[in-house]
Amino acid sequence: MLKIFEKIFGSKHEKDIQKIQPVINRINEIQEGLKGLGDDELKEKGKALKSRIRGVLMPIEDKKKELYRQLDNPELSLEEAESIHSSLDALAEEYEEKTASALEEALPETFALVKETCRRLKGLTYQVMGRDVVWDMVPYDVQLIGGIVLHSGKISEMATGEGKTLVSTLPTFLNALTGRGVHLVTVNDYLAQRDKEWMNPVFDFHNISVGVILNTMRPEERRQQYQCDVTYGTNNEFGFDYLRDNMAGTVEEMVQRDFYFAIVDEVDSVLIDEARTPLIISGPVPNSDNSQFQEIKPWIEQIVRAQQQLAASYLTEAEKALKESPQSPEAGLALLRVKRGQPKNTRFIKILSQQGMAKLIQVTENEYLRDNSSRMHEVDDELYFAVDEKAGTIDLTDKGREFLSKLSHQDRDLFLLPDVGTEVAAIDDDESVIAADKITRKDAVYRLFAERSERLHNISQLLKAYSLFLKDDEYVVQNGQVMIVDEFTGRILPGRRYSDGLHQAIEAKENVKIEGETQTMATVTIQNFFRLYEKLAGMTGTAETEASEFFEIYKLDVVAIPTNRPIVRKDMDDLVYKTRREKYNAIALKVEELQKKGQPVLVGTTSVEVSETLSRMLRARRIAHNVLNAKQNEREAEIVEGAGRPGAVTIATNMAGRGTDIKLGEGVREKGGLYILGSERHESRRIDRQLRGRAGRQGDPGESVFFVSLEDELMRLFGSDRVISVMDRLGHEEGDVIEHSMITKSIERAQKKVEEQNFAIRKRLLEYDDVLNQQREVIYTRRRDGLIKERLTTDILDLLRDYCDSVIDRHSKNLDTEGIEEQLLRELSIEFKPDRNNLEENATGVSEELYNSALAFYRRKEEAVPADIMRQIEKYAVLSVIDKQWRDHLREIDTLREGINLRAYGQKDPLLEYKQEAYNLFIQMLSEIELETLSLAFKLFPVNPDEVRAIEERQRQAAVRQEKLVTQHDDAASVYNASPGAENEAPLQRPVTADSKPGRNDPCPCGSGKKYKNCHGQQP
């Protein structure tokens, strides 16, 4: 029905393009008029455009500067400050409106100027990444359309080879005229550097400064690059600089400007694929101990071997039962136990690909899952540990606990968590025990919980490392380090680590150095970072399949840009085999056939392991080829550029050359163009479209096909039942290949199922992070104010006023004058003796008296301490307290999130529970920030130069405390899975150390998410 309407009325994309066409005509008309100008005259046109736009914006900027200057006045009243803030808000709206209208008016002239500049640069030879390049690019009309779409704050979907990099120069040039800075976001440092050098002649012609942010740069270099009109860089670098700026100790240490306009290249990769991975800056945990991994590792290796032997016996049992009856329930149960015990067993995977086996296992599993999985324990009880591969969880069974108990010669109870609530309640109810002994006994319960919780957590992570994470698939080992491989691109992710001790577990498994545990110091999700920009746009060749997510999360519309020339690539149906062995042999034969023909072939793989397997097979056949994967990525650009030569064979993981064109060599067009051979379907249709898109650029011929087996990961986990039934109906025999549109559609349905699941994870992640994001905005705004303001005395005295009211209000009901004296002496180091009668009759007056007394003390301190030192004391008090409290708050939020899904068992919505408790923690943190800031400002009293230098040194160290950059990978997202059923493990705590009582501000070990002092640490 929808297609009928589109035929009659036109599609959305066609209507979008029709609206833009008159502007394109106007741009080309203006460009014709520019051809007669000399170079200097053309440059003057650019200067005039910039002056015109700046002339509109500068008066508003001057007004804002004046208002900010007024805010620094220490005598300013609260009402006057609020009035100024209202004026600033109004000016911000006016500024945004005038910027938009000025740029809209200048767009045709600016785009024409860029197009004419490109025309004049034709034939220019210059250096890009150390190689000579000749400029031969002038924007086509479709590229002008793409540029307008980007300027409008939308996503421009352009096919491979349509010149997205050149398109970006059009809106970048236009928005750079504002002087506010434009960010071009790419997926890696190489592309950032290359694109900056490649497009620089256009900007350089008009004296528009261009910078690039690279991973190796120092803060001083970064600041210079951000001051440029245009700055290229990766999403990670922009995001980490944002977090680092909000940890800076001085204004001079901050590197970024405001977030005005960002254009994201490969927007689907950055805003979709990376969105499950928060950006995290972390520092080492004091006194962290990784020795337990080495202690536990021998036990885990033995229990894993025992499980493997158990799985082998069940497979033998199943094979015997299947000979007697193809639908044997005994065989179904045995195979289900293998699926729950060792799902990646190669023998099991082969059986799974046989006719009717996947269905038999599913029917058996459904039987045991009835009535809320009430019988699933009958399956799992015979195993040492149960694996849920889809959910990524592992649960130690009673049999496993018994095994570990005998192995370690320790009590079986050591592998069980004590019921803290029940045991503490029993202690409280025991009237024969005095209060002091109750505290001692409770501490013993908490210590026991912490010890066992940490041990069980480490056991669980080691079991995951051995059962679910494969070397050369999820990670590689290089130079004695475990390096995560990006599941979407196949690239190594330097500096990234799995969270919650999983990375340390894999390091123990691989016998490399176990790095220390880290704690979060600052964090932001990709979604919430890019929401900081006033205007956001993106470009990619594959966005349409995720259009709804782009709009729902980022409010970004997707506009498909027509190609300059029609795409003539042939996309063939999938070729489906039963086993991987059959599939790999077929791939090797096809590659050999294509090489003999002289047609270049790009073989796309989903993992390092598969790329190396195929490489070995081709070497055995003496077929010359290049391999591009996470282990061998240094020659990426060179290999990809040569992949279009006659007879070239290139094996590449998904990383293959996004952002690098594969140009066809001489005579290749006549032989059919580049042949894309996918060795496996990826879980995302978009990644498959990207692979196909390597061929057929700019109207070139090309072919693409995917070779699939029923043993592939996607088919095994999500799609094999339906595909096997289709193959059975089509009469498939061992060794046969099936090519049918029904099969291809079934595979795409499986991919859609995974995409929906991943979208749900990303959306859930965002729902949780939105809570923290609102808190982050409050804290970062407070911190930035503390950093930028010259004087913080007014803020300190505002805190003092509230503090005095709070102290008097707290003690006036009981006329507790001693309590007032004690609190003031402890918290502010000041003496004040209130009159008991006044406290009863006029508490407000006593509060005013206290304020005046404290103010007089503070004024005397100001007179005694040099003004510049006093300003440093105030700044240090504000910044150091915010940093410490925010760091502690992030740890508490982590602890809260780890166990929040368990609330679903109590018929409560985990998200609502999380919002409420996170809010309570935040309010409590703000209260503690205010008290500690005030206390530090009053108590810190340097009396000699050494103490002054100590304050300066502490400020400097606070800003530099960024020992390790860590972005937590997939494991970070698992916390947000909505289903409590996916959480088969005991709640993963970040326990207190086993040899000490929890600190008052540490998370309570009971898992409530509250501070110890407000939970089980309360005095009885």
Curated annotation (Swiss-Prot):
May bind 1 zinc ion per subunit. Keywords: ATP-binding, Cell inner membrane, Cell membrane, Cytoplasm, Membrane, Metal-binding, Nucleotide-binding, Protein transport, Translocase, Translocation, Transport, Zinc. ATP binds at residues 143, 161-165, 661. Gene3D superfamilies: Helical scaffold and wing domains of SecA, P-loop containing nucleotide triphosphate hydrolases, SecA, preprotein cross-linking domain. One of its GO terms (cellular component) is cell envelope Sec protein transport complex. Pfam families: P-loop_SecA, SEC-C, SecA_DEAD, SecA_PP_bind, SecA_SW. Its main location: membrane. It is found in: Cell inner membrane; Cytoplasm. Its cofactor is Zn(2+). PROSITE patterns: SECA, SECA_MOTOR_DEAD. Its EC number is 7.4.2.8. Zn(2+) binds at residues 1004, 1006, 1015-1016. It catalyses: ATP + H2O + cellular proteinSide 1 = ADP + phosphate + cellular proteinSide 2. It comes from the Bacteria. InterPro entries: Helicase_ATP-bd (IPR014001), Helicase_C-like (IPR001650), P-loop_NTPase (IPR027417), SEC_C_motif (IPR004027), SecA (IPR000185), SecA_CS (IPR020937), SecA_DEAD (IPR011115), SecA_motor_DEAD (IPR014018). SUPFAM superfamilies: Helical scaffold and wing domains of SecA (SSF81886), P-loop containing nucleoside triphosphate hydrolases (SSF52540), Pre-protein crosslinking domain of SecA (SSF81767). HAMAP family: SecA. Belongs to the SecA family. Monomer and homodimer. Part of the essential Sec protein translocation apparatus which comprises SecA, SecYEG and auxiliary proteins SecDF. Other proteins may also be involved. Part of the Sec protein translocase complex. Interacts with the SecYEG preprotein conducting channel. Has a central role in coupling the hydrolysis of ATP to the transfer of proteins into and across the cell membrane, serving as an ATP-driven molecular motor driving the stepwise translocation of polypeptide chains across the membrane. This is Protein translocase subunit SecA. The lineage of its organism: Bacteria, Pseudomonadati, Chlorobiota, Chlorobiia, Chlorobiales.
